[in-house]
């Protein structure tokens, strides 16, 4: 064991994941794996206005198809040994490795449940004029035992998707700056992605294992959501970064701030419901100006997280004659005084 937190909810091992997994006695509920994509082939990509190398390290260097299959089969078999009979595994990839992962999972007796498409809402432009921009990654979700009933929080996923069935295409942003305050990893996954995975497939108190832990995003998300974490990685530098991130959320203010941020979906649309008298409502529609009182008194609106996603306004008069309007620009609003509104023909009473 390389590290164990004071609360025993964050355990790290340093070494080859295949070897460490064979020595583990414990059984885990869910595995999240972000194995090498084998993308490091000497190529480049555009970042900002610069052309930078895509090489992540020796561990990500391109291999032959036979070597990729052999590598994936070995670590997947090792994972199967520590997974509970009704447990599930999530594996990330791109077209470079995901087909091999799917084949090896099936060959090892796993049953594929879903293949999630993570569509990045802020993809990095890809160098070249002969192909579409690479903006998606894929996540295979599979269960160990084809006959066992796995856990899926169906109701919560519907709730998170506005009452509709959660689709298998997830539009989520890449890693935000607020996730890199302790440092960063070249293939770091966003906490919001792990939030959805963990909430969908685990219960509070469950144990999640990551055989390619890196900077321990899985562990941070797990602990923020009252799950236990076991992580394995060969890099001492990244394990130290993971420990730093764990210690960062020991601060209560930081813990609750992060807990709130990972549950937010920047792509979610906010609708403001606004009451207006009949004459005021007609004037709002005619002028294209909608106003509402901001503050903390009765009948006013507080500016809260999510307001920046405001895209629609629902106008009504005493709950009747409801009309929905789309803003010209998402999240755009101005603070006007009573005098400014009067110049536009309105007569606000406060």
Q: Residues of each region from the PLM?
A:
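Core catalytic lobe of class I
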Residues: 1-232, 237-239
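A general structural signal for short secondary-structure junctions and capping/turn motifs
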Residues: 130-132, 159-162, 303-307, 313-318, ...
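Short mixed-charge
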Residues: 1-4, 253-261, 340-341
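Aromatic- and Lys/Arg-enriched surface recognition patch
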Residues: 320-350
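Conserved SAM-binding loop
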Residues: 242-243
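Conserved phosphoryl-transfer catalytic core
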Residues: 53-59, 247-260
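Compositionally biased, charged N-terminal/linker segments
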Residues: 257-321, 329-332
